Amino acid sequence: MGAFGWEQDRGAPFSGRSPRILTRMTDAPRPTAGADAPARPPAAPLVAPNFITEIIERDLEAGKYPRVVTRFPPDPSGYAHLGHVFASLLDFNTARQYGGQFNLRMDDTNPELARQEYVDSIADDLKWLGLDWGEHFYYASDYFDRYYAYAEQLIRQGDAYVESVSPEELSRLRGNATTPGTPSPYRDRSVEENLDLLRRMKAGEFADGEHVLRAKIDLTAPNMKLRDPVLYRIVNKPHFRTSDEWHIYPAYDFEHPLQDAIEGVTHSMCSLEFVDNRAIYDWLMEKLNFDPRPHQYEFGRRGLEYTITSKRKLRELVQAGRVSGWDDPRMPTLRAQRRLGVTPEAVRAFAAQIGVSRTNRTVDIAVYENAVRDDLNHRAPRVMAVLDPVKVTLTNLDGEKTLSLPYWPHDVVRDSPDGLVGMPGGGRVAPEEAVRDVPLTRELYIERDDFSPAPPKGFKRLTPGGTVRLRGAGIIRADDFGTDEAGQVTHIRATLLGEDAKAAGVIHWVSAERALPAEFRLYDRLFRVPHPEGENADVEDDSAGPAEHEAEPGAGQETAPVSQGFMRYLTPDSLRVLRGYVEPSVAGDPADTRYQFERQGYFWRDPVELERVDSREDALVFGRIITLKDTWGKQGGGTQQKAEGKKRPSTKGRGPDEVRGEGSSSPAKAHAPKAQPLTPEQDAEFTRLLGLGASEGDARTIARDPALLAFVGGAAPGDTFAQVASWTVNELVAGLRAGEVKVRAADLAPLAEGVASGQLSARIAREALARAAASGDAPLTIIEREGLNAGLSAEALQQVVAQVIAANPDKAEAYRGGKTALLGFFTGQVMRATAGKADPQALAAALKDALA
């Protein structure tokens, strides 16, 4: 196949059609039965502790910034895809966690490929995902004038020059890893000549590639990025927003840091392939004297198996007709996933299971698919549909019966937090009221493969003379059957037996007389190998480009020919179309209802087909969102890899997330032998822990360790479980293995609730947890007894504020002189002096009054 308090539509029909087209973030709450289930508060923290949050907390404590500002900067040359989910949610959640600001920026610096349709679709898809940037929506093109002014400033400072050699010569002059770069004849042009040439470049006097503007840094630098990188290039193409006003466009390494500084971004997060580019970022911040200045931080990139996210390759799939468009449900674009029927809650739940580290990692696509299944299990009412029908005549049934069958199985009813379940048309009712009428008639349809004239051993469905139970309707016996000339079964004659009859199997069915005809589109993974553009791909296939920007943006990479070697790994039957029947109860349901067709999978009506002008109300087209179970597990996890004949590199002595070591830009392989595989018992526990809300990493660690598993067995299920699991793995693990932890897991849920509600800080929670582990007292009892979370009176707070200001007169004077960023410094000092007991809002008001 192809989390926080969200206020989202419940999967409204897809409307924005394209033209043929980890830190563990907060664990998304499991949806309760039905789409109108009551919302649950989010678990906390929004972003679990990691190296970036540690930096942010140090910066805030030191008063480096008044508040956190992050940004997500997609390149509008294609549609948002699953590869953007982790990074965008990390940026958004981080800003929210620290009460900061999140910016959405369109990096529209490539006039050849940037389009308004891509801007609109990206913004629409990110809103669907749950991101909210308010008024902070920006285009890089809004600041072309300012970029240009900075370019002239660099020239006047002697820090930039116009280069006039050919692109090939420029590449040669840069040298390589063992040879330093060589100055070109134009490196020492005068300021006047450089300014004249840059202005003429801007005016459009020169052809593409005739000149570029380069930074003058260090041609001998070991970091090749510092060898006089290109800042501006000539592109004589109209821009979708500025038309033909500009003939030069900034390179990514120039635009990115400048735009961060202009927007007031504090912590600029990007993936690991930009680690060397940070040197240019820092050089520009120093040369242009931004204060306070932003800083760039790199995290390990997250890839997804059985998927490609290169926009060039996705575009090639569309152009080659291998998919129907950018919204083809087999594509990894968010637009396609929306059409497929995946909900934003499922995508966020997937992102919640991915951790932030400094190591690249490829995520098993089963993690994503299981998040989709878990979401739909509690969202999709059960009905019956027959996709490949064969007719059955019940010879002893004279009239029609109306059966009342439940929408929900017992496990969904059991897990409902309010004891109610949803109805397809909306609203929540008692489980016994959540039923639909299903007609039982003389003629039925069953699945063709549910009847076998010559059954193999172990076949438990219908056979000649054998019995089977019809779901909710009773037991039938096959008396005889007919075939066509090819030997294919055309009809079955059967008898409806009494309830005292016995049958080994259960099958689904629909009334042949009353069921609705429908088309069923069965989508599967687009690629048949885990790494279609990596270890499985042709050696000449390029797969090194960053997620958002190539090494030299706008230098032709996006328009260069793409190796089609990856296409050899397309799944031949990733789309199968069948025509069958669905029970008539669906006729009155909202078009966006997601169903579980029993024994078949999760489906919904294709929203694009609903929009077609020539569609009729009775022309039902259902697309399969996901199968009920992972049908790829064996072939993808074992057999497939052996067939490819690839040997895995040794990882002896390395940690589970460090196949190439922290900070390496080389990706860790998803199936590299990081540890022994889970035993069947451990795998069952792993699955159970995931279902309870634990992150993938925490669940795997706990499932392997009897001491940890025994401890969390006493934890209460619910929204706090993920935090309890995280504390178990990260705070209590050593003590549990040594048998020294005295606190009960059941006592941790109230502590987690306190953190989630904001009543307790993470620091106080960890301190109380450590004391509880040693004493056995409940953490909240310790907090109350020892006053760890006791607030300050207004008078006491004012006294501390006055003392801090008196101890820092120079900073107080600077603040009053306009350096308002120092408010963060004073906040940190007061928090330190009060051991974190000051209420943040009261503190902010007290500081502003005292510094006025």
From Swiss-Prot:
It is an enzyme of class 6 (ligase). Residues 1-635 are annotated as: Glutaminyl-tRNA synthetase. It is found in: Cytoplasm. It holds the Pfam family tRNA-synt_1c_C2. A motif ('KMSKS' region) lies at residues 308-312. A motif ('HIGH' region) lies at residues 74-84. Keywords: Aminoacyl-tRNA synthetase, ATP-binding, Cytoplasm, Ligase, Nucleotide-binding, Protein biosynthesis. Its EC number is 6.1.1.18. One of its GO terms (cellular component) is cytosol. Its main location: cytoplasm. It catalyses: tRNA(Gln) + L-glutamine + ATP = L-glutaminyl-tRNA(Gln) + AMP + diphosphate. One of its GO terms (biological process) is glutaminyl-tRNA aminoacylation. Transmembrane segments: none annotated. It comes from the Bacteria. L-glutamine binds at D107, Y252. GO terms for molecular function: ATP binding; carbon-nitrogen ligase activity, with glutamine as amido-N-donor; glutamine-tRNA ligase activity; tRNA binding. Residues 28-38, 664-675 have a biased composition (Low complexity). Residues 636-852 are annotated as: GatB-like. In the N-terminal section; belongs to the class-I aminoacyl-tRNA synthetase family. This is Glutamine--tRNA ligase. It comes from Deinococcus radiodurans (strain ATCC 13939 / DSM 20539 / JCM 16871 / CCUG 27074 / LMG 4051 / NBRC 15346 / NCIMB 9279 / VKM B-1422 / R1). The lineage of its organism: Bacteria, Thermotogati, Deinococcota, Deinococci, Deinococcales. The gene is glnS.
